[in-house]
Amino acid sequence: YQGGEKAMADFKSMIRNELPAQTYMELAEWYESVGCTDEAVTLLSCAGDYPIALYRKAYLLHQSGNDAESRSLLQRAESLSPSMVFPFRPSSLKALEWAKTEKPNWKIGYYEALIWWANQNKAKALQLLEACGDVDYAPLYMSRASLKEGEARLADLQKAEKIGKSWRTGFALINWYVSNRQWQKAAEVGKRYMKAYPSNYYIGLKYAKALCETGQYQQCISLLSKMQVLPNEGAYAGRAVYRGANLYRAMEQLNQKSYKQALKSIEASKEWPENLGVGKPYDNMIDSRLENYLEAKAAAGLGDKEKASALLTAIVQHKSSRSNFESANLLNALALRELGKTQEADSMASAWSKDFPENRIAQWCTAIYNGENDKAATMLQVRDEQTDSAPWEASFRDSNFDLIVRLFSNAR
């Protein structure tokens, strides 16, 4: 690009990726590292009005003695919106620290925080974001909320909503209430944002979950029927809520002795609606123990002992995982007991503590099996007070556990 305007135009014409500013910055960083400051400045100029490039260029010009142009670039960088600016290079910190001493403003601290966050220093990132003070920029509060826990996170999310309402702020708010099991509040916020963003299935799925957990099963199922979830790897959430709503409704109907209605709800729970973004696996890959257990209860209520026995036998024949404890294993033991095989059932339940001594779900299932309901309730309370783990921090997620908890809560 050193051969004049045409050479520069030819050079720039070959930078065709989605984020050309990042390519220029990467090249500029190399030239700067080998002492070719003029070349680095030229490359940073190619990045246009990308704030981080302007700060780095201003820093290099300052080092070269061109303070007038350097100050002009600082002013230009300060005037630009930080929207869609996501710095991550630690090498940019030196220029930003210098800029902060020359012309301090909250955006510099925000950019620094994003860099530290991208490089796994969350404590430093939060410290910098806190130092930004009260600013009129919702993504800053969204970012800061992500680094906080509990009520402090909620406070920042609410600030973000006041400044700039968007589907992202709505999703984060609903998600906070869902994570903290404040289902009624989640439903209220979900309803509000669903009206504003009716085609957004991220919000829709969280709202549907809140409707399900507040006992509004038909509204939940109706909402899911109108939703179009984009199929993607692991897109099980929609079907999980659909299944849960039908099974929760079946549990209520069993308690009301509406056995025929319960059977209809159980049958509906076995469906895999195409619009919810996930296909049905092979039958031998589906764990139907909970559905079979509820169906057995309904059949027994209708006096069909033969069908109830067949369903309980199907539960017993299910092969459980040897590597992970599943809450549905409780149903295996209970089915054995209800079939009159008490000794085998007791042996199975007593083995859980030996095979999975640290597993809290196994401990809860043991308590339920032994009729220690108060102990089981205390364990649930401890679970609810814990901070949720990220998906990659949990080696196994038990999709039946909350449903089984509800089943035995209703039974009490």
Model-identified regions with their sequence ranges:
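"A position-specific structural signal for the A-helix of alpha-solenoid helical repeats
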Residues: E26, R56, Y111, P139-S143, ...
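Structural signature of alpha-solenoid helical repeat junctions
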Residues: L19, D49, P104, D136, ...
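Amphipathic alpha-helical segments of tetratricopeptide repeats
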Residues: D49, E78-S79, G133-D134, K162, ...
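Structural motif corresponding to the intra-repeat A-B loop/turn of tetratricopeptide repeats
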Residues: V34, S64, N119, L147, ...
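Flexible helix-coil transition and linker loops at the boundaries of alpha-helical arrays
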Residues: F11-E18, S83-V85, L96-E102, K159-K162, ...
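Residue-level signature for tetratricopeptide repeat
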Residues: W30, L60, I115, S143-L147, ...
